[in-house]
Amino acid sequence: NPDTIFTLPSLVNGYVAKAKTDADRAMLTAFEAELYASIYQDNMWRYNRVDAPLLPLPDDIAKWSAAQFAYKLNELYTEALRLAKADNKPLADYKNDVEYGKETLDYIPDIYSFILYRKVENLSEFNEKFYDRTKLQTACDEGAAMYAAGSPEAIYWQCTKIRRAPGYRHYDEYLDLYKANIGKPGAPYALAQAMNENYESFEPEANATADERNEQIAKRDSMIALPKQAIAKYPTFY
């Protein structure tokens, strides 16, 4: 039944008070936020067109506006982060409850940073009209500040801040971050982001001028050269 999803957030909310630890409550609250995010993303075109006062939130989630979803997500993530800060646990403790990639723990080792990551990812789906996106930049700064400069965790958050910044191409910013951290544990991640960014612009557009074409080719060549230089300089690091 498609309507079942609208009942799931309140169902999960009912388990929050029954949880035995703040860490469990934090993860359940974040899961509740995830459900609201999923509802919004499945039909965002519809919710984006709803014009309604921010508060009170309608009992019927199907009648919410995009701004109301953003408000609710921000509220839930704020509470989840408060709980996680009081009882931060390794994310690996929840390996049976949360799906994550093999390298995730290198960058997001604990539940606080995981919840912060999900906050940034889900609230980034809202445009500036519905959510102040400068708050995403602030959240990334918070994430980076939790870890040692140049560490994989700190570089991850700095790259996330770059990725969520206005604009579509951030190659130069990733490259500058990499160069500023050469020799530090997080440098490979920044380099990988620069490479991924440049892969997307390998081929000059059909209507590109000669100067634009040469600039794109030069960036491509610099991308190919960077890993070779890095491996040559730090052979045991990569």
Labelled PLM ranges:
Residues 1-238:
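Extracytoplasmic/secretory-pathway proteins
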